[in-house]
Amino acid sequence: MRRLLSLPFRLLRNILRRLMLRTVADMRGGKKQRYAKEALLRDVHEYTAVWAYLVGAAFLFMASEMALLVPTIAWTGSAIFLYRAWVRGCHGYYVASYQRNLLRLPLYRMESRALRQLKNQFVGMGFQWKSIHAQRLYDIELHKNERFTRFSGSYDRARDYCSRQHHGLFARALARYLDSDSLLNPWRPAPKLEGKAWLHTVGMPEGEQPIYQPLPTRVSHTIVFGTTRVGKTRLAEVLITQDIHRGDIVIVFDPKGDRELLLRMYLEAKAAGREDQFYMFHLGFPEFSAQYNPVGSFLRVTEVATRIANQMPGEGQSAAFREFVWAFVNQIAKGMVLLGRTPSYPLLKQYSADVEPLFIDVMELLYQRHHYDYRKRLAEFEAALLMSAEDRRKAGFNFTIPRAMNDRSQRGKAFWLLYREVGDKLPLTMTERDVAMSMMKAFQTDASYMAKLVASLDPFLEKMTTGAVSRLIAPDFSDPTRDVFSWTQIIQARGIVYIGLDALSDAEVAATVGNSMFADLTSVAGRLYKHGADHGLPAYPKSGYQPKICLHADEFNELAGPEFVPMLNKAGGAGVQVTAYTQTLPDIEARVGSKSKAEQMLGNFNTVVMLRVLNESTAKLLIEKTNKVNVSDIATFSGSSDNPDLTSRVRFRATVQSREVSQSVELLRTSDLSKLPKGQAFALLDGNNLYKLRIPLLQYDAREAVPNDIAAVARAMEKNYSNSPTNTDWARYQEYLREDDIFADGTYSSMQDLCNNYLRELDSDTFMQGQAALMEAE
């Protein structure tokens, strides 16, 4: 109700503010600056002239006879005085608003529906950072202008009063008043955005503009840097919302698990009419998650071994053992594919422990496929294996079994002997013969010796097949209640996929599954790149919009691996546009193992967005791409000298000089990036043009119904992944949602009742908007 009553006052204030700033802009537009130095950090002397003009206008209007003027002339003079008062007032407001915004900027909120019809990619409100902004920033940081960057003493005392406990009725009421965001409160608290607000204020005199990223440039990939809790995920919400409503294929990797991001994706998919295309894969909630096989889809069978071997250590002597792992897994994968079995981690674990069952199945298939009656001869070999060496010679069997095969079964040995005898005579294809030779080699190798060579494979497979995670990455196609997806299916259906990797619980499994998914997606992208965008896809009408594959990778440093390099290098031709979010450059270096590999990855990102970063090497990625500019200051020199001529009437000479002194500085400094408030960023767009951005905090138009499974996951994510110190951060929705959980525990007759229950907790106007939205949806 309080907001509703203050709405007319806020509206009137905004109208007057825009009108006054427009007046100043019209008067300044197209004119050269009158003075060598812009003077925005000074006392607002214009208001004195405004009062003088107003008094003169009132005097001429009400007492023209005392000015000895006829009323017509007096009223004309009064109108001129009023006009001059307006002009000088606008100039004064221009300076005063600039100084006021040095300490506080209002929160930038936006309704998500405003992003649903944009042709280009909106990244925020801001301006292009130029030399004038570096000049203003230089002026602000001068010691003589320090008073403009400090709050008043009364404001500090008000904040100190609100921070203490109060027990009296009047004291508590006063604390609530001083802590309220009301126009009637001259000491209302500044938004808790941290950082230095003037980094954005320096561009406010010219005004903010919507900053867009042209869609064709997105295939050259984007990387977003920012330290913890400064707005990376909120920027991701802005970009993902537009991708969903544009009809693109959206794939989001979220290692840590962000509740608001999951809800945002589902609600925007529902608003776009794409609810049926939404899939959720979450390692932390297997009971609600869709299923996916990381090694079940491939273009070449060798990709299975590559995806697994890439998870093995490959530095130093470990590189040789990784090659053994690759060869062993490749042998198993070839046998499974020949049998028509889809590779999966549980099956790979089973056959890596004992390859004999796979060997027997492959041999039986080959004999049956080529109509060879092997059973009689196989039985003879089995019987011969039970004989002594002398009896075998008498029976006409002249063979020896390698010592490495002593632990194998009699049936397996019989198949091995049979293939040695008749293998060359069978009309096998090249592929079949290759698989048969691989199986023979794997079978006759000493199991204990092979176990030592591929010792690093067992821990990896244990990670991937332990607990409930194994049910997610080994899909059960006979279960009708669980969705199973593949990347080809997602691309065909223009799907929207949220992938929660639960890295806070198990970072190793999260990284492994994420890398396997990347490798699978890279394979699919390679197929599209070679055979065209329509390969395996429905025939889209040529006049329609060709959907892109929008890949968003939060906490990119936890997912970066060898699989990511070919995706960045070549997948742009298949329509894959990657947006990666990470904290620092050293995080990526630590993940990939070297600085050169990290730079190889970063060289493929043409668009860089940098929120607050504290690491100097990370900040230099942006700083080194900007040029130097000249900033100026007015230096005053004074001096005096005595006149030695005693006969002259001039006893001394005094001089005062003002000089404009310039110096070369960086257009942007590393220290500026460490002082950015939350939700603000610098970005290199459109060919290394530097922009300063404010990222909007998206608001829900009204809470819509959310399915029970997604609601349960959201509740658990809020409980398990969040902690109380961050609940007041800018990067959360506490500004417009109450602290109560959006999904209250209890039983509801319908999802509409759940939605209504939440909306009743909001103010009345929001509740009415929500009711109207629900009725319109019905």
Where are these regions (language model features)?
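Basic- and hydrophobic-enriched, low-structure N-terminal and domain-boundary segments
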Residues: 1-230, 234-239, 287, 657, ...
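Hydrophobic alpha-helical segments involved in membrane association or supramolecular assembly
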Residues: 72, 76-80, 511-520, 607
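Short acidic-hydrophobic sequence patches enriched in Asp/Glu that either
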Residues: 94-102, 257, 261, 563, ...
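Short acidic/His/Gly/Ser-rich catalytic and metal-binding motifs that mark active-site loops
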Residues: 289, 588-589
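Conserved H-loop
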Residues: 583-587
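Short hydrophobic alpha-helical runs that function as membrane-insertion/retention elements
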Residues: 249-253, 277-280, 577-582, 608-612, ...
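P-loop NTPase motor core of the ASCE superfamily
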Residues: 39-44, 76, 316-334, 485-489, ...
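P-loop NTPase motor domains
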Residues: 16, 20-26, 202-206, 215-228, ...
